[in-house]
Amino acid sequence: PLDKPIRVVSAAQGFEFFDGDTLVATSAPSGFLPPPPDAPTPDQALNGRSHFPPEEAHAFPSCFVCGPHRKVGDGLRLFTGPADGFDGVADVWVPAPEFAGDDGRVRPEILWAALDCPGAFAVGFGDNPMVLARIAGNLHALPTAGDRLVVAGWHHFHDGRKHGAGTAIYTGDGQLIAQSEQLWIELKKA
């Protein structure tokens, strides 16, 4: 649920998040994550952007992270497509000032959002719309708004409607800022 209050309740291993009486999410410490691949170069990432699926093919064109209907500052506009020379998808991202805290650093919730959709495009979202079922991640640093970053995603596995992916955000020179491991579920065809 967006643009509405969510009730947060402390649980044994983390937190539970409720929309009214409906449990919509849980959180818990993620523990160790495997190291991500080396970062694609900014040029490879820009090449990935040029291979992002066409706007009319996007299942969720108003998505905050990857929606082509979003304007700069209203959404992240991450358009991760297959990047030549990198086994996955990538894009260059320059976080807008609207996504920074008072200290000029990109807010953690924005980094978590940026880790989301690249995983879907790495596992075939353009062909089969999916939703995120689980994400585990680590934020290693908070970049400054206006920094030139590289966002990447890669495929781990496919099992029926389940798909595993990893994502990462790197500095322009390849230093890891944040990473995630994800489980995506294909939507059932109508």
Feature-to-residue mapping (PLM):
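Short aromatic-glycine-enriched beta-strand elements
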Residues: 13-15, 161-167
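A structural microfeature
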Residues: 25, 178-180
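Non-catalytic linker/capping segments at the edges of enzyme domains
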Residues: 12-103
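Surface-exposed, gly/pro-biased binding rims or lids
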Residues: 181-190
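Hydrophobic beta-strand-centered segment that forms part of the acyl-chain substrate-binding groove
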Residues: 1-5, 9-11, 112, 116-151, ...
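A mid-sequence, solvent-exposed acidic-amphipathic segment
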Residues: 73-140
